[in-house]
Amino acid sequence: MFQEIDIKSLKGKSKVARLRIKPDVNRTVIRKPKWIRTKHIFGSKVDQLKSTLRAQKLFTVCEEAQCPNLVECFNHGTATFMIMGQICTRRCPFCDVAHGKPRTLDIDEPKHLADTIKKMRLKYVVITSVDRDDLHDGGVQHFKMCIDNIRLSTPKVKIEILTPDFKGRIDKALKVFKSCPPDVFNHNLETVPSLYPKVRPGANYEYSLKLLQKFKQQHPLVISKSGLMLGVGESEKQVINVLKDLRRHNVDMLTIGQYLQPSKYHLAVETYIHPNQFDKYRKIALKLGFIRVASGPMVRSSYHANLQIKGKLII
């Protein structure tokens, strides 16, 4: 039996306590504009989905990261499954996932995941994970087991994976994915390179680009995807340069959304980007050659991912 862990105690203040660049908790919070729409968590479908997930000991990044679209997605019966536990080995200040020493991997999770997907009759699933720097392979073998179990149980389901950077283990990870490529390979850059020390401590911009490029080189027919969150201090020129970098590294799909601060202990919102600016970035990205672009204040990496892949306008 696992000892119960108070996940809330591993979030917020305790999570960012040892960061070199700490969020300013005394900073005045910027009022959200009218175009930022979030909903309260309620409804029978939401409760039903949560009950199904807990019964199978599964978690969603929607819940763990306090995604503002949780109610909408849950009410449509969709979710982004988060594998390998609720505890991340990184402490990114924009993210509300807990930080600490993760538990041992649950060897039954891949089967539970596949069974749940079959029970929910899903046609498109997104699988992401916490960072597992404690594992010798970064968790890539567990990703493979999940993909294999899903394909065995529901072979027609489309699978998108949103991966960590497999820091120091890119070649090992790519070797594993050779035998089980997903339908969409997603790895988010999150922000512009100059803001990495503040926004993504422990990550490396060039390294993330390298992961995306190498995967695409090995799997030219698999769609590659990445995402950015705006409002943390980036300039328009910096954003456009990132879009160009992504295209130079053969990334096909793009998501761009507004960063929202989970609590006062997290990275502060510097500005709320107007919807017109998001539309401008969408048009620029399409001109640069991205085949699919979802750009809008409430867009998240896996928000309506099944519609993104079909080219539907997501804002």
UniProtKB/Swiss-Prot annotation:
It is found in: Cytoplasm. Its cofactor is [4Fe-4S] cluster. It catalyses: [[Fe-S] cluster scaffold protein carrying a second [4Fe-4S](2+) cluster] + N(6)-octanoyl-L-lysyl-[protein] + 2 oxidized [2Fe-2S]-[ferredoxin] + 2 S-adenosyl-L-methionine + 4 H(+) = [[Fe-S] cluster scaffold protein] + N(6)-[(R)-dihydrolipoyl]-L-lysyl-[protein] + 4 Fe(3+) + 2 hydrogen sulfide + 2 5'-deoxyadenosine + 2 L-methionine + 2 reduced [2Fe-2S]-[ferredoxin]. The keyword Transferase applies. Keywords: 4Fe-4S, Cytoplasm, Iron, Iron-sulfur, Metal-binding, S-adenosyl-L-methionine, Transferase. One of its GO terms (molecular function) is lipoate synthase activity. It is an enzyme of class 2 (transferase). Its main location: cytoplasm. The keyword Transferase applies. SMART domains: Elp3. Pfam families: LIAS_N (PF16881), Radical_SAM (PF04055). InterPro entries: Aldolase_TIM (IPR013785), Elp3/MiaA/NifB-like_rSAM (IPR006638), LIAS_N (IPR031691), Lipoyl_synth (IPR003698), rSAM (IPR007197). Gene3D superfamilies: Aldolase class I (3.20.20.70). GO terms for cellular component: cytoplasm. [4Fe-4S] cluster 1 binds at C62, C67, C73, S302. Binds 2 [4Fe-4S] clusters per subunit. One cluster is coordinated with 3 cysteines and an exchangeable S-adenosyl-L-methionine. Belongs to the radical SAM superfamily. Lipoyl synthase family. This is Lipoyl synthase. The gene is lipA.
